[in-house]
Amino acid sequence: NLMMRFVEIIMAIPSLIYIILLMVVMGPGIKTIIIAIAATEWTSMALIVRGEVLRLKEQEYVMAAINLGASPSWIIIKHLIPNAMGQIIVRITMDVPRVIFTEAFLSFLGIGVPAPFASLGSLVLDGYRLLSNGAHLFIIPAFFISLVTLAFNLLGDGLRDALDPRLRK
């Protein structure tokens, strides 16, 4: 319960504020972006995993393993992790577009990936600055961000349909 209260406190403030604050404190860079995004994105995964484990804990096969004297670590390894893995994989594929968009947004603001490295957000920013020279410099990276986001959302939706036993017919 203590960890969930901590997660709720972190989730009460928009993650973009945390990320921008960490970017300002730690300076721009790829490592900083990875740390900043990972420091905020784990909270939604924690809620999903907790809910799934609480649901699985009430299943008959888990209760049978407990009654037969199985150790908690054995139950976690043999029952909870394999049965929660589908939800975890689906959640990861649904989180990837948000992470890509967050990184692109930070780079568009100029606090993301530094200049020698390419980023979708920095490409959109460069295209925006040169919009009068050619709209394609702005449209192509923006379209690619949309395409990647759509692809990962469709992948996550397909994986959810394939891995969720409640949706199987």
Question: Could you tell me what each predicted segment is?
Answer:
Residues E52-Y61, L159-R166:
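Transmembrane helix boundary and interhelical loop/hinge segments in multi-pass membrane proteins
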Residues M26, I30, A39-T40, G86-M94, ...:
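C-terminal transmembrane helix and the adjacent membrane-cytosol boundary/short C-terminal tail
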Residues I17, I33-A36, M63, I75-I76, ...:
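Hydrophobic/aromatic positions within or immediately flanking transmembrane alpha-helices
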Residues L2-M4, L54-E58, V62-V90:
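Amphipathic cytosolic juxtamembrane alpha-helices at the membrane-cytosol interface
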Residues L68-A70, P114-P116, R166:
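A short glycine-centered flexible hinge/capping loop motif at secondary-structure junctions
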Residues N1-R55:
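Generic hydrophobic transmembrane alpha-helix motif, especially the helices
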Residues M11, L22-G27, I37, V53, ...:
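Glycine-rich helix-loop "coupling/hinge" segments at transmembrane-helix boundaries
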